[in-house]
Amino acid sequence: SVVVDTNGQPVSNGADAYYLVPVSHGHAGLALAKIGNEAEPRAVVLDPHHRPGLPVRFESPLRINIIKESYFLNIKFGPSSSDSGVWDVIQQDPIGLAVKVTDTKSLLGPFKVEKEGEGYKIVYYPERGQTGLDIGLVHRNDKYYLAVKDGEPCVFKIRKATDE
């Protein structure tokens, strides 16, 4: 089925930016943070000091204007023309399988957006044929890192970034 935003409108394929609003951590937005002594902040976190946070785009190579739950997606920060800020999942202690931004994207992204409760969860597929793994939150150092936590997804509502 079609993924819809908080206005009930279909989420667009790459054209629009959206805020991911966590259902259970409503006063936090997406931001970037460091893990350990990294030179640059590349880990995706929910930060209570960042609202509404960094907007994301959902991109599928399919020539269709809207996003459906069955589609493999790239999720990324930044403009659609750029390949920076693309989400991936990378093993990094002490977080585990952490969501981090990279400068490369595969044609078919490794994520799907799937209905969960009153919102949507992000599901990571390490391989096409494998079972998906829920993206949840790992709490460290006053931040909530997005990471694989299967069975404990973080549920988001998707709000179009132009709707202030």
From Swiss-Prot:
Keywords: Protease inhibitor, Secreted, Serine protease inhibitor. Belongs to the protease inhibitor I3 (leguminous Kunitz-type inhibitor) family. One of its GO terms (cellular component) is extracellular region. Signal peptide: none annotated. The keyword Isomerase does not apply. One of its GO terms (molecular function) is serine-type endopeptidase inhibitor activity. It comes from Bauhinia bauhinioides. Thermolabile. This is Kunitz-type serine protease inhibitor BbKI. Pfam families: Kunitz_legume.
